[in-house]
Amino acid sequence: MTTQKTTHLTLDRILARIGAAGLRLDHMNAVEAGAGNISVSVTADAGELGLAEHLPQAHPGTKLPLSAPALAGRTVFVTGSGCRLRDIAGAPEANVSAFVIDDGGATGTWYTHPKREYQRPTSEFNSHLAVHNDQVERRAVGFQSVIHAQPPYLVQLSHMRDIRSTKELNRRILRWEPETIVQLPAGIEVLDFMVPGSQMLMESTVKALRDHVMVMWSKHGIMVRSDTDPLAAVDKVEYAETGAMYEVRNLMTGGLGEGVTTDELRAVARAFNVPTDLL
């Protein structure tokens, strides 16, 4: 998506899509209580979006958790720390705020609502901001959604030492439905456990999401990105989580399932012209 095509998204539309994504993740049991967070970056500024009408409290000069110079002049929406993602659809302004990034990227004007249900943005805001900045810097994306969630089957597999690698996790989740390789041709990059919100996790996530749309934070959750829509990012999670569900169920039944063979997956990839090096 080019930068010229992003400003047609109205503020109401952006908040509605964030809310819909939160509900879908909740239905997947991937965001228990206040877990999980969502951000969206767009090229539009406060005036184009009408931020002051929906989020009337402006806090200029708010320091960002890291410098994001590529985002200067852009707006980043982000969910609040401790907010339940399932509540966003019914009360978006209470659970989502927006930052319009200043020149230089060290600060921004933070737009909030008087009835906000949080004190600060999500504790993972550093990773969200870093991914947005890196993707804009490298690919000039005009719109991007980034989501962190904790899908139970994927997380469960990441607790298993013999599965906790990029090669093995992808082998396990790709073999249950032919659609999965089509939807996730690069698979999931698997990271070792790192402290949530840490500098190490942020840097590793930025690197992983350059070549993948989804990264596994072992024993914690996933982060996924989309250039089109928050729900498109959730779709990727749903495909991966379904594969993980089948794998867990197969393990519970003694590994009786054959799954889609590597040769069969290669045939699918050829038929749909899927560019992948996983097979």
Model-based region annotation:
Residues 1-279:
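Glycine-rich flexible loops
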